[in-house]
A protein has these predicted regions:
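Glycine/proline-enriched, intrinsically flexible loops and inter-domain linkers
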Residues: 1-242
């Protein structure tokens, strides 16, 4: 909330300084530049369709379950077209809401293909997402619970997208894109809730993020995979080094 407020104030300050028309013109130009840059990079991927699948693991109701889901990627004309499908939605919080699916689709694209391209609407213009038939774990409908969409089904979407992009990069004629191929990010964590009495004598609860991001990353062509890594959807998360 604080970041959104600060960002809004700075945009208003820019509008006051340069005028709304100038700001909109430059913003549109920047979006077009990002779109052109990503389209050019996608065009260096081999045309065609690739597919993969994953499972969402969940045992919150006492019985270990595996919920299968699928992904298909078509690269053509500078555009990445994704189609997802999965089993019918379930009465637990793993169902993938729209934000969880779309956010976890674009995160691997940002770190693997658009790592040096400014992120704005122009990036989204190069990506089409089809979540398939309503009523599944990738396209749930009310009253499906979705409070952990980003870390459950969403995280598996990120794993599938990174696999598809790595496969496409490996088959590219571009040495730059071939160097972007990488192993899987963990996209998993051991979630824990810590609680106790704080120094004021009140109950305190917190969720440490170390187990979500302080994990060895995947092997890459330019690194050995021993960096601090975790969910691909947490691109800039920080935690205290204590």
């Amino acid at each position: 909330i604080a970041a959104c407020r600060a960002g809004g104030e700075r945009v208003l300050a820019l509008a006051d300084e340069y005028g709304v028309e100038t700001l909109e013109t430059i913003s549109a130009h920047n979006m077009n530049l990002s779109e052109q840059a990503l389209k050019a990079r996608i065009s260096e991927l081999p045309s065609g369709v690739s597919s993969t699948h994953e499972w969402v693991e969940y045992d919150g109701r006492g019985t270990p379950e595996l919920y299968e889901l699928f992904a298909e990627m078509r690269a053509e004309n500078g555009t990445l077209n994704f189609r997802f499908s999965g089993r019918e939605q379930v009465p637990c919080f793993i169902n993938g809401a729209q934000g969880g699916i779309e956010g976890n689709t674009i995160s691997p694209i940002l770190v693997m293909l658009a790592y040096d391209i400014p992120f704005n609407e122009g990036i989204w213009r190069c990506i089409n997402i089809d979540r398939g038939e309503p009523g599944t774990i990738v396209n749930p409908v009310n009253p499906a619970p979705v409070s952990n969409a980003h870390m459950e089904t969403g995280a598996k979407i990120a794993r599938m997208v990174s696999t598809l992009i790595s496969d496409a990069c490996s088959a590219s004629d571009s040495s730059l894109l071939r160097s972007r191929a990488a192993g899987q990010a963990s996209s998993a964590s051991t979630g824990t809730a810590w609680f106790g009495t704080n120094r004021e004598g009140n109950l305190s609860v917190f969720f440490p993020m170390d187990l979500a991001v302080a994990i060895g990353g995947p092997a890459q062509t330019v690194a050995d995979g021993q960096d601090v890594y975790g969910y691909q959807s947490t691109l800039s998360i920080g935690f205290p080094d204590i």
